[in-house]
Structure formats: C-alpha cells, structure tokens
Amino acid sequence: MGKRFSGVSQTMSRFRGWIQAGATLLTNLHLPNFLKGGLYQGAGKTVCVPGLNCYSCPAASGACPIGAFQAVVGSSRFSFSYYITGFLILLGVLLGRFICGFLCPFGWFQELLHKLPTKKLSTKKLKPLTYLKYAVLLVIVFLLPAFLVNDVGMGDPFFCKYLCPQGVLEGAIPLSLANSGIRAALGKLFTWKFSILLAVIVLSVLFYRPFCKWLCPLGAFYALFNRVSLFQMKVDKSKCVSCGRCARACKMDVDVTKTPNHTECIRCGMCIRACPTNAVCFRYGFGSGKEKENAATLRENNKA
C-alpha cells in the first residue's frame, strides 16, 4: 500500500542539494586518485552506480551503467548484459527518475551551473527536443555498438566515445592534467568532446538541465518507468486549489496536477515546496484504486 509522507517530502525537497552532493561523493570516493592520475580498479568497479558517472573518473567508486551496457552490447559475449539490464530495470521500478533528481552527479553539475546569476531561458517551446534522448538510447547506445562491429565482432561504445560530456569532465581532463603522457596523446576526438562539454556548460547556464532533458540516454531509460515506479508524486485533490503555482515552479515543464508521473518529472520536489496547501507530496509503494480515481478526477477538474 502506498504511503504519503508530506513532512518527509518537504524535508527531502528542501535538502535535495545536500543529498545530491552526498550522492556525488559516494559515487566518487577515491578523491586522492585525482592527484595520482590513476583509476580505482577494485571490486567496486564491477558494480554499476545509478547515475551518469564516468568509469574513467579517477575517483569513481563504480562503473557507469551506460558505459557498462555498451561494453557488453559491443562484444560477442552477452552474459554480463543481463545483469546490467536487470539492474537498470530494478532501479527504474524502484525509483524512476528520482535518480535523475537526487542521485546523478552530472545532473547536479548542470544545476550548479544554472545557479549562476545570468539571464535564464525557458525550454517550454523546445519540448520536441525531449524525444532526442530516446533516439540516443536506441541508436547510439544500443544499435550502433551492436551492429557496427569490426572484423573480430567488437563494436565501439559510441555514446561514451563520441558524445558523453561527463567522460571529458570527469575522465579526460583530470587524467590529462595529472599525466603528461595522456596529455601528449590528446587529439581531435578530445577536441570534439571538449567542444560538446563546453556547449553543455553554456546551455546549462541558460537552460535548466539541458543534457538531462534532451540527450541523456540514462534519463531516457528511467523515464520509461516513471509511471510505474514505486516512487511517485501524489496530488491530494481535496487540498488542491488549482492555483497553478506547482506548474510555474517546475523547471522540467511538467504540470504535476495533470500528469503527476510524467516522463520528464525528476522528482525534484519544487512543486511540493511551491504548493500553498501541501497538496503535493512524494508517495512510495503501490497506489490504491481510490488514489488513481482521485487523480483522474483531479485531471478532469483542471480541464473544466
């Protein structure tokens, strides 16, 4: 049975930045490796972390799920891919895009950039771009590594190699700064990916989490489970006064009263803090039929 916890919801949303910082630290525990210019290669690297965090980051405690998935898809052996796929499905069912909002290091990085005091631009008219990330997931993460293979049947990790800005931020830059050999070997591919990183940085200052909205394949995968995950948004129709504050507060362009578990909702809790009547909160568990009926009634009332 689902549980509503308004007090917990308020606390989680209020301290979300600290939770993001803690999650980033836990994902990157081996900080001395930044000075050494080496990678942690212990048992932790056989386990995937939930967010987008590069395997090649000197401090990384675990493997990136997208990188690990591509590694097995691009090989002739698929015994390990079942573990990775099952791991991602489990996280999707348990948490959905809560991972994006609370546990992803690169999502937090974009949010910090967006806090810089400059003019901000809305993404509401750019909603069609949100479908790009599903194409990235299907084509670049899965199809290209699986079917564009060399003579020995190995495919490249196309997303990691050609598109992922996190790999440059966490991997290439710190490793090249600490290692002259790596620095001397940097070429056109590094220039290309560094340009992507710069573009994401600039866009993140102007737009809220642009990479998450438009290009992140991990976010696309978790989004597929947002409507069925155990961690969901709950709107109490008896408390809602249809003021629209929650929709205006949402930087992911979601109206929680109409679609409380929209694929773009990252469970950041901004709507919870904006609601003047405490009608919105997190809910964890399986919803009852009455709750679903109330949600449907609320959507109908908002249309009226």
Regions found by a protein language model. Name each.
Residues 1-257, 263-304:
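Non-ligating segments of multi-cofactor redox enzymes
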